Amino acid sequence: MEKNLWDALHCISTTTELAVLAIYAEAVSYPYMKAIRAAKDKEQNMLDLGPFHHHVYDHMQKIINNPDILIRKDSSYLTATLDGNEWQNAAVVRKIWDLVPTLPHFKDLLVTFFKGAADTWKRFTSEFAPGGLIDEATAEEKDIAWMPATNDENEGALGSFRQLMH
């Protein structure tokens, strides 16, 4: 088992995949979760998050069209992250920037990954599409159908038990 781990940690393909996942987390996942958690804390209606979900898709398209805003050593979190805030793990980002020249397929894999993520994002958020039911709903209708910004209350066995008890 140790040899497998050693081999994986010294495999260019594995390193490339891990670097792509980590930089995606820094650019999209962490900022998204921070925003959704903030919306939950503010008791914001999930049905009002359509514009934010469109922003996520647009941000992924921006990186697809110009991945250098994310992977050059002079890249700024101001344009590279979804929220324009500092990196969650700046040391990880710097390490990835150092590794990029040694990973010959990094940029292509990054763009391919972001394209797949954007396609999936569009499919998962289709109910927020302009002209759709949620987009066309009035504020009163959205209030009547209010939903929390996260599904945390229903996650896991404890969440299911809690829901059952109420």
For the regions a language model picked out, list residue spans one by one.
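A sequence-composition feature that detects small, non-aromatic residues
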Residues: A8, A19-A27, A35-A39, A80, ...
